[in-house]
Amino acid sequence: NTASIAAVGVAFGEYFGYFVSIPAGGVQMVAVISIILLTAINVAGVKSGVWTQNILTIVKVGMFGGVILLGVFLPGTESLNLLKNSGGASSLGAMGMALIAIMWTYDAWIEISYVAGEIKDPGRNIPKASLLSMVVIIAIYVLANGVFISALSIEKMAGSTLVASDAAEVYLGSAGASIIALAILICTLGANNANVLTSARITYAMAKEKLFFRSVAKVHPKTETPATALLIQGIWATILTFTGSFNQLITYMVFASWIFYGMSAGAVIILRHQKPDMERPYRVWGYPWVPAIFILFAAWLTVNTILEAPRDAAIGIGLILTGLPFYFFWSSRKGSNEAD
């Protein structure tokens, strides 16, 4: 998730460059400043982080709503063909790589579980919030992409780094492009604020389980936030900001994440067999077919990434492997303490 924070920070830097001329390496520096700012907001208190998130989410939904309305009331310059296929033997592999970015845009589906301990009636509210948010997000993304394609064509979209702004320019000229670029700039802050807010809870939970430094499990005496976990997360995200482009960073992140997502789905099946009587506040719908299909998809996505982007996959695997010695070290310490 720190790779995701770094990636969104880089995206913020790229859109910032739409308004201000940035020298070489400046995108990463802008990304670092945005990460520091959001980390400070979330250290200051949960309420400040949540209020920031609510405001930025309203702006984000409003921006996408505006883009969708452009497509409804103004004619596009391209014919809308959602079934267009370039063909070729490598189409399946290329589709898998395209899915990397798509799965990243939907990756927040899991992040609500990171703050489950701070949610009232999580057994009821988490599934409800997850389902509702996914339906809304899918509708917004599909409609917005239809507008983008009708304005730019798939080929032009593939060659653009500022798709929403370029689409707005087709409809409204340079003024419209600037407005959308500003809205996207705010949207990236909103997305990253959600990442910063939720992801630090993983490190915090690990420390509470005695799988990391105990000091990380402490909350700030005044703000009652996991300040140390937030600071560690911010430092690591800052370092990752300088390790690659936006596309490379999300490839590291999605590749590594889906290995664990697949393993988590496998754990559902294993636990159903090993502990059939265990209390389950939430039971997987469509068991065992839904987790089985999920596992197959996760396996295909990770294998395809290895074949199509071996360098990025190797870095993702390397990031996982660097964490294993620390995990085994803390696990052994936890076992020793419990034995004592």
Regions flagged by a language model, labelled:
Residues 13, 26-77, 89-90, 130, ...:
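Membrane-interface loop-to-helix entry segments
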Residues 1-35, 39-43, 184-205, 230, ...:
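Hydrophobic transmembrane alpha-helices that form the core helical bundles
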Residues 14-22, 129-196, 211-248:
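TM-loop-TM module centered on a large, flexible mid-protein loop between adjacent transmembrane helices
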